[in-house]
Amino acid sequence: MEKISAFFVILFLVSSCLVTMSVGDICQTDRDCVEIGIPRCKRTGKMPICYNGYCCCICSAKRLPASTTRKPPSPSTSKLV
């Protein structure tokens, strides 16, 4: 009986790890979505984008533009003593 219980505990732990790995981030760039074989979006016909680690078709409106301007240093941090 103890061996069966231990087997099920190990099986549960292994399956939990597999679920965690499959639910994690699947992309870091838009190109990753193409390489893993995500099909074109049905509504737009465009390729999905990578948004927060997931390939997404409806996220393009929510994507924040990359800022190219740098924030000037504040006076308190730019002083040399």
UniProtKB/Swiss-Prot annotation:
Protein's cellular compartments: Secreted
Main location: secreted
Cleaved signal peptide residues: 1-24
Disulfide bonds: 27-50, 33-57, 41-59
Gene Ontology, cellular component aspect: extracellular region
GO BP annotation list: defense response to fungus; killing of cells of another organism
Keywords on record: Antimicrobial, Disulfide bond, Fungicide, Plant defense, Secreted, Signal
Family that this chain belongs to: Belongs to the DEFL family.
Protein name: Defensin-like protein 311
Protein species of origin: Arabidopsis thaliana
